[in-house]
């Protein structure tokens, strides 16, 4: 959520920045609502003051032995008017808040202006895509060769965009997540967390999934007698529960940064992606991801973004997977991000780079929703923290990249050296 004072005092400047990311802010409507809010605020305060004054007069008149019935009726009438004014003010403030919850974050000044993914800017590349002297197989073919990917079984169990992994392919999938967690906790300074996969509405509002992206979530549908659980949803990313761990907290600045990681399944309806990536593991309703989250002082967030992106890059480098780093343009950034780097890994069968990590600085956008603050020992005043999140990495897509980049002419898959300790020294699948 944006700073309400910024919306009130600099609406045109806010509108101009939002226009860079293709969002039209209705300045006139917000201005009219704000003017009405001011009028109601003054009216409410005046009625409250008048009611307090009249109530005091009742006591004074009673002490003098005077008739207080007319004063009592007047105070009652003022009370009714005050209640009505408060109700109108509350409704108006709720309307303003509802609008504010649909407004995306402002882009950082250095973010390239653009409409969509075609306007993203490549920053760097690492590694050289391998030249194969045989016909490249995609991960689906390789998975079926080794009886490791069973999409038909998943359709029987659930439906499309799910998979059953088996044998050494399933083991490599597990090895990848363990390798990522060990790297982030042992070398990058993150603490490992195990979090709920179901979260409530407040949690989803805190990180910005609600109200705008309710259609992207899988919501629980409880029995009537269990209606208290009706507001749960499956997490679309571990960013949601991890970031909300600081919701409503005031953190000692000496304890910052807080760096957290978690390996979880992620659940997404993939609304709007019908017909895209229908083959294989690239776009699933359920997929695993190792997530990184940082809670930092405001002045440290841009440096933290560079650090976090480097942590995701390190995973790819140790796995020996060629990738490129891009900065997303204003029109392609996520709702809450002010600046985002994507890492795209080389997928040989598609002869292109595909997203495998997205690392974002969210500034105080989520912190304002969550009321997550920090305070230094020398200053009693609190301020909002900055939050960052990043994939470190998407496990399924990393599995795809390893299978395809490490395939052999005979269909075997070489196990990257860094994964072998997690696979009992296995050098090849097949």
UniProtKB/Swiss-Prot annotation:
MF term (GO), any: ATP binding
GO BP terms in the entry: selenocysteine biosynthetic process; seryl-tRNA aminoacylation
Alphabetical keyword list: Aminoacyl-tRNA synthetase, ATP-binding, Cytoplasm, Ligase, Nucleotide-binding, Protein biosynthesis
CDD domains from the UniProt entry: SerRS_core
Record's subcellular location: Cytoplasm
Keyword Transferase: no
Associated pathway: Aminoacyl-tRNA biosynthesis; selenocysteinyl-tRNA(Sec) biosynthesis; L-seryl-tRNA(Sec) from L-serine and tRNA(Sec): step 1/1
Domain remark in the UniProt entry: Consists of two distinct domains, a catalytic core and a N-terminal extension that is involved in tRNA binding.
Subunit structure: Homodimer. The tRNA molecule binds across the dimer.
HAMAP family the UniProt entry points to: Ser_tRNA_synth_type1
Listed name of the protein: Serine--tRNA ligase
Gene that encodes it: serS
